[in-house]
Amino acid sequence: MPKFEKLTLPNEGEIITFNQGKPNVPNNPIVPFIRGDGTGVDIWPATQIVLDSAIKKSYGDERKINWFKVYAGDEACELYGTYNYLPQDTIEAIKHFGVAIKGPLTTPIGGGIRSLNVALRQIFDLYSCVRPCKYYSGTPSPHKNPQNLDVIVYRENTEDIYMGIEWEAEDNNCLELINHLNNVVIPKSENLKNRSIPDGSGIGIKPVSKSGSQRHIRKAIEHAKRLSGDKRHVTLVHKGNIMKYTEGAFRDWGYELAVNEFREDCITERESWILDNIQKNPEITIENNARKIEPGFDKLTNNKKAFICEEIKEVIASISNSHGDGKWRELILVDDRIADSIFQQIQTRPQEYSILATLNLNGDYVSDAAAAIVGGLGMAPGANIGDNAAIFEATHGTAPKHAGLNKINPGSVILSGVMMLEYFGWDEAANLITNGLSKAIEQKKVTYDLARLMEPKVEPLSCSSFAEEIISNF
């Protein structure tokens, strides 16, 4: 047990342990919580009472969360001193107890940590950010049919541009790097000749690794295995058409993982086309199958034609018995889409998607865009998951002007708590909360952010009253 400088442990409770990335959760886990800055003072108490009430209703005295208050953000500075936004106590507590939940955190002032959220993800190697985007009936939305969108965004959390490896324009290190790239590296790269980085540029590095990509996509596929029907579907979202060696590699490594590690569980989109063509026409030739899966096949070079035909032969030889005759329809479909097109498709063809596996930057964009469709960040939960820790969090900001007014929507943190309960395997309590929240919204008993958008106008509930309304629906 670590020694804490200024923290008080709960009187009882056990530690959550991890085995091969999966949590072993006792009936009385100790769970650190960070209240959060700004409106955290309102939304965390509302969340805690909802979670505790659902657990009590579902399991009686058999299960209980023992809450352990830890500090980050402005509240940490008040206790630990100026600029101490992320105390060592908090780091040690989360490391020891494994799972934590938090409200929104401020952006630190001064040098050092740029983002507390990013710092926590990097410290604990929380490599997958999980953002469900689901519509709750009655929630105001700018879209005609928001109920058609039900996706889970798996955003890689530790690599890509968000690693923060960058240099300011005119910084000496930046100038040295540009000089080296322009005069040494670029001239040696056949595909980059006649290009150069302009003077006065800032430089950011976009690292994307095979190991980082595959461990993240593995989490997405493992999640899909728990789903049923058309929801057993993972889409690799990328800009590989432009960034071939980073975003394109992410796509390729995802397919490689699916067919090598999850062969019995997965079918790629292209493989499904090949097998479907055979099922519809058992006499189809290799060449005609190729014409169906590859537009413009007859205009390709002979080498490319031969490559595609070999691909089809390999699919038939390797999986026609195990995946053919329609059996592939019961498996996880793995496909890919260009990032900019997915922004259109989650609006125009939302039913076609389930789990979106993305790199860091794309995932940030897509998850917020999807949240807007189903009602905004006030109802958008999030989790950051690694192999030895998990942190569940509000996805919105601190909204300091509303702090202490008991008016803000606690839905984001409450639903993040639901994700935590599901992570524990406490599905009965999780379902109780989602059903209670759904009923509250359907009955138009909501906080001001939703009430002001409803027609006809309704009288808003306070933050705490909204929590009580959810509990009353248990």
Predicted regions and their residues:
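Glycine-rich phosphate/nucleotide-binding loop
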Residues: 2-11, 76-78, 328-329, 343-445
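N-terminal phosphate-binding or glycine-rich loops at protein starts, especially the Walker A/P-loop
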Residues: 7-65
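Structural/interface elements that position substrates and couple domains in central-metabolism enzymes
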Residues: 12, 32, 53-54, 58-59, ...
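Glycine-rich phosphate/diphosphate-binding loop of Rossmann-like nucleotide-binding domains
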Residues: 26-27, 32-34, 38-48, 181-337
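Buried hydrophobic positions in well-ordered alpha/beta secondary-structure cores of metabolic enzymes
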Residues: 37-40, 98, 154, 220, ...
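Generic secondary-structure signature for well-ordered alpha-helical cores
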Residues: 52, 56, 60, 96-99, ...
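N-terminal glycine-rich phosphate/adenylate-binding segment common to multiple enzyme folds
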Residues: 75-191, 202-203, 360-365
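Glycine-rich phosphate-binding loop
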Residues: 93-106, 266, 281-388
